[in-house]
Amino acid sequence: YDEMETNTPQKKEQQIEKKSSSKYINYETVDKDSPKINIYNHKTGKTQQMDIEEYLYGVLSGEMPSDFNIEALKAQAVAARTYTIHKQENETSKHKGSAVCTDYTHCQEYKSYEELKESKGEEWIKSSYPKIKQAVNDTKGQIITYNGEPIVPLYFSTSSGKTENSEEVFSTEYPYLRSVDSPYDKYAPKYASTLKISNKDLESKLKSTYSDINITQNNLSSQIKILNRSDGGSV
């Protein structure tokens, strides 16, 4: 695999170095195409073996809209491949004898060719699927590493303009998953949303969770305040 090494020096700038490595999977010694991995299909309850790059076609199709810029799709392909290799190389993260599963709440979103054809239609298959395949093929074998090991690329759709430190969202602190400004998120389709809830409904929800809470819909504004924020600005 080609590794794109991330370093976290004392200064804020992060450096990325691309280098060649066959530590994890060497295409030349596996077969002429690419290595096979075991995937647990949570819909069928069965494990299937699949070419890793073919698997990534289905992941990329499910994780990112095909009308996004090709470079964004390539970046997503590298992140998804890195995630897959990390799961493959860490025994504790495997389940049901497989490296990954098709359940996006546990691993990554995955749509088979048949599912894509049924849900998106023939026109999408003809016009957009080739772009998905190009993004995967153009980055074939590329993963991101830190200190010589595949990183845990906990990617997500959209931030509020600044990402979070990993421990603010998950239980583990990773030196390469630090809060940074992400100003381009404002162009994302899901950047901002508004949810309106009545004082009565909020009171009901709070009391259903905290039965001993002393609060009423009449004094919400005086009893609710922001106590602290994360480095990323989240409440």
PLM feature segments, named:
Residues Y1-V235:
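Conserved, single-site charged/polar hotspot
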